[in-house]
A protein has these predicted regions:
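PRPP-associated nucleotide enzymes
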Residues: 1-138
Length: 138
């Protein structure tokens, strides 16, 4: 539901989880086989967790932050964690990158560029719940 000023979208938890289930169906329908999931904290943690459980794949977490100003609604400088948290081993093979939102696309582009520079990753694809009309990452 959009606010009266049209600036904010409010989504119920039920709708949020339905969107995650739809995303899981899209990933499954793609037929792409992946080895691990990497979610971007904070927004990608819940979708990443659910997809990890549905597909029974290890979940890695990378912390990123750029929305700090104006109550967390204005994008600022992008900070990315130096390390990726994994339950065991390293991020490798075919990796599904998961986040909640591709807003400007800056975060996803920066993370993808960093991951593509990692020789242990053989293939990389992304899955997000929402993509804005101005995102440079699709």
């Amino acid at each position: 539901m959009l606010t009266d000023d049209g600036k904010h979208l409010y989504v119920s938890w039920d709708e949020y989880h339905r969107l995650i289930e739809k995303l899981a169906l899209k990933v499954h329908a793609s037929g792409w086989e992946f080895d691990q999931i990497l979610c971007l904290a904070r927004g990608g943690m819940r979708p990443g967790d659910v997809l990890s459980r549905i597909f029974d794949k290890p979940l890695g977490i990378m912390s990123t932050s750029s929305y700090r100003d104006d109550g967390g609604t204005l994008q600022g400088r992008l900070d990315m964690a130096k390390y990726i948290t994994m339950p065991k081993g390293e991020l490798a093979g075919r990796v599904l990158l998961v986040d909640d939102l591709a807003d400007s696309g800056v975060t996803l582009r920066a993370v993808v560029d960093r991951l593509r520079a990692m020789p242990a990753i053989s293939e990389l694809r992304s899955a997000v719940l929402w993509v804005t009309g101005v995102s440079t990452y699709t």
